[in-house]
Curated annotation (Swiss-Prot):
Chain sites annotated for binding substrate: 49-52, 105, 110-112, 116
Enzyme Commission no: 1.2.1.70
UniProt protein name: Glutamyl-tRNA reductase
Other comments on record: During catalysis, the active site Cys acts as a nucleophile attacking the alpha-carbonyl group of tRNA-bound glutamate with the formation of a thioester intermediate between enzyme and glutamate, and the concomitant release of tRNA(Glu). The thioester intermediate is finally reduced by direct hydride transfer from NADPH, to form the product GSA.
InterPro entries tied to this protein: 4pyrrol_synth_GluRdtase, 4pyrrol_synth_GluRdtase_dimer, 4pyrrol_synth_GluRdtase_N, GluRdtase_CS, GluRdtase_dimer_dom_sf, GluRdtase_N_sf, NAD(P)-bd_dom_sf, Shikm_DH/Glu-tRNA_Rdtase
Reactions the enzyme catalyzes: (S)-4-amino-5-oxopentanoate + tRNA(Glu) + NADP(+) = L-glutamyl-tRNA(Glu) + NADPH + H(+)
GO MF term (any one): NADP binding
Residues the UniProt record annotates as site (Important for activity): 95
Domain-related comment: Possesses an unusual extended V-shaped dimeric structure with each monomer consisting of three distinct domains arranged along a curved 'spinal' alpha-helix. The N-terminal catalytic domain specifically recognizes the glutamate moiety of the substrate. The second domain is the NADPH-binding domain, and the third C-terminal domain is responsible for dimerization.
Pfam families: GlutR_dimer, GlutR_N, Shikimate_DH
Length: 416
């Protein structure tokens, strides 16, 4: 039984090559069936994301799996081979556990990869390319990833600007879900901020953007209200939290506008997070008594501290994945021993059945009973001791005392 993991990721290949070896959702079902047909066990799972494509197979030949990948995508070996990595046995198990735990991700400890691995496993089950070994491998992997997140602090600290902005708001407001939020801009960063806010239960969001259509498209997904930049003065007094990220060369919020809004709020505090470069909010806003202004530099210092914390947690996570990969291989070896015992018993029974049938035929033909029984016993003894005798002889000739000792112990010779 041999587990194989072959892949390509953001560390080994350019985005251009990663796109070429990726599997689209509408094709991955048939792709897994095709890949599984190239293994002796019929087991295969394909994990394909924007940052990685990995093939996990049981009883597959490495060279054949690589050839399949190249054939499937119509790529030259010389273009793909230098960017591939491969793992076997316990190393393959450990690699999958590291991937699912976020230890091999572009952003250390990011949780999205676990959901992507789970989705790949579900698709493989639907395709019929999962049996005992791969099923146990992935189920164990999901348990390990959960253990990593509960037993370490790898996912506790923010390491993206968007996540850090929302984390800061959570520390300042005791119940962020009841706050009113004004988001300025409708780009990727603000969209990610909106996602984190929604995940934290924020229901009241307003998105202000230069282009109303762009803001409306984003608001549909998050249940927010879209406004233009010109409407900001009307909505600013209602905002407990303001997070801004536009490409404007000039500030969007000036000290005067914020001061006026604070007066209308009767000086209830307002958190303003400016993650734009150049800045969207005039730095003088920080001088206002009830305004708490943070910039992208403040967030980066938090992120650096948090990344150091994640790296420390990652060291603990590495120990967990190492230990759990050993335990999984113990289970694999137990399966192999069961298979060996079953095969040995089956072989011995076949020898017995053959010789008993021959003896019964001789008795039916009138042969002497005692002679037939003696012949049966001798033939059965010779058949059963043939393989052990050969193994003992070979170990003795080679001077392999370790193997010789193990054979003597297995055959019960040391008991006499």
């Amino acid at each position: 039984m041999s587990l194989v993991a072959i892949g390509i990721n953001h560390k080994t290949a350019t985005v251009d090559l990663r796109e070429k070896v990726a599997f689209s959702p509408d094709k991955i079902h048939d792709a897994m069936k095709s890949l599984a047909s190239r293994t002796r066990s019929g087991e295969a799972v394909i994990v394909s994301t924007c940052n990685r494509t990995e093939l996990y197979c049981n009883n597959g030949d490495e060279a054949d799996i690589i050839a399949w990948l190249e054939e499937y995508h119509g790529l030259d070996h010389k273009d793909v081979a230098p960017c591939l990595y491969n793992y076997h046995g316990q190393d393959a198990v450990r690699h999958l556990m590291r991937v699912a735990s976020g230890l091999d991700s572009l952003i250390l400890g990011e949780p999205q990869i676990l959901g992507q691995v789970k989705q790949a496993f579900v698709k493989a089950k639907e395709a019929g390319t999962v049996a005992l070994t791969i099923d146990r491998l992935f189920q164990n992997t999901f348990s390990v990833a959960k253990k990593v997140r509960t037993d370490t602090e790898i996912g506790a600290a923010a390491v993206s600007v968007a996540f850090a902005a929302v984390s800061m708001a959570k520390h300042i407001f005791s119940s962020i879900s009841t706050t009113k939020v004004l988001l300025i801009g409708a780009g990727e960063t603000i969209e990610l901020v909106a996602k984190h806010l929604k995940d934290n239960g924020v229901a009241s969001m307003v998105v202000a953007n230069r282009t109303l259509e762009r803001a409306q498209g984003m608001c549909e997904e998050f249940g927010a209200t879209a406004i233009t930049l010109a409407q900001i003065p009307d909505y600013l007094p209602k905002a407990d939290i303001v997070i801004s990220s536009t490409a404007s060369p000039l500030p969007i919020l000036g000290k005067g506008m914020v001061e006026k809004a604070l007066k209308q709020r009767r000086h209830q505090p307002m958190l303003l997070v400016d993650i734009a470069v150049p800045r969207d909010i005039e730095p003088e806003v920080a001088d206002l008594d009830d305004a708490f202004l943070y910039t992208v530099d403040d967030l980066h210092s938090i992120i650096e501290q948090n990344m150091a914390s994640r790296k420390e947690a990652a060291e603990q996570a590495e120990v967990i994945t190492e230990e759990q990969s050993f335990l999984f291989m113990d289970w694999i070896r137990s399966l192999e021993s069961v298979d060996s015992i079953r095969e040995y018993r089956s072989q011995s029974m076949a020898v017995k059945d053959e010789l008993v049938e021959r003896a019964l035929n001789k008795l039916a033909q009138g042969s002497d009973t005692e002679q037939v029984l003696i012949e049966l016993a001798n033939r059965l003894t010779n058949k059963l001791i043939h393989a052990p005798t050969q193994a003992l002889t070979a170990a003795s000739r080679q001077g392999d005392l370790n193997t010789l000792g193990q054979l003597r112990s297995a055959l019960g010779l040391d008991k006499h």
